[in-house]
Amino acid sequence: GEMPSGASIQSGKVTISGHETDHLIIDQSTNKSIINWNSFSIHNKGRVDFNMPSSASSSLNRVTGSTPSTIAGQLNSNGKVILINPNGVAITKNGVVKTSSFTASTLGMKNEDFLKDRMDFIGNGKSKSVQNKGKIIIRDGGHAALLGGQISNSGFVSARLGRIALGSGEKITLDFVGDGLLSVSVPSEQL
């Protein structure tokens, strides 16, 4: 079955183990990491674990190949995971994501924006869809964001004391204002 492959670490200190197995482990010792992948999918018996220093740590994962991401297995992290794939992202009915925060986007994000905590996403003008038919479970106070040209959420999203954002457009900013509220701004010309 499909598992993430072709990792290229762009930023941060990361070791990846479990290649060619059903259980991929990504150990991150820096607060942030950026990883470009040739492909990033998880088959229904597969599991990917991101281990980070804390729940405030984050990893930007960008697919540079031509295949969509299908999450049919388990994606776990004690920290925040951002998955960007312009070819599309789908969490199937068997897929389970458990993280402190999770963002799936078909819009792109610049490395420098991520490293400076700017959650700015820009599409290519015809961004593909993000679909959730599975379960996204966010730890207390975190956020789940699905961002794409089209969003379909027929699955389950739990973010106790946290925020859920569904954004459809070609330019989206996630804004965490002082009280922890999440605002999704889509420029008016996109509406």
What role is predicted for each listed range?
Residues 1-191:
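Extracellular and secretory-pathway beta-repeat/beta-biased strand scaffolds
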